[in-house]
């Protein structure tokens, strides 16, 4: 969803987490959440945006990262942004809910000490992808994953609010 991409030239002391938490709500539902956020940090403005786009092509592995725990500052940052963006309650299609992002991907690059370029690109269904190889031996046979392949998911729904979309009022939005 490049039309919802964001770029900021932050000061070196500015918090990337704070910027993301301030910026994500301004993107509305046009990026089709839940999805991923690709974040590029460093280089120039152009490089930060390229890093953000490249980051979106990485494999979704947040469940694995949460299970094993962070092993670097970058993984700690990914988890912090993931948890805090989901805590915003934006939810699927911006209608409220527990899951706004499925993963956070970050790539960084050295930059001038006087600035901190940060680019953020959200993905939508158009950028979700699968990897496969065509070897010329015949028709591609892509097998859908089994339900057992998906992780078991549980959450506390006590703070959730059920919304009747057929009868929602402006005040309830």
What are these regions (language model features)?
Residues 1-173:
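Non-transmembrane, aqueous-exposed alpha-helical and coiled segments at domain scale
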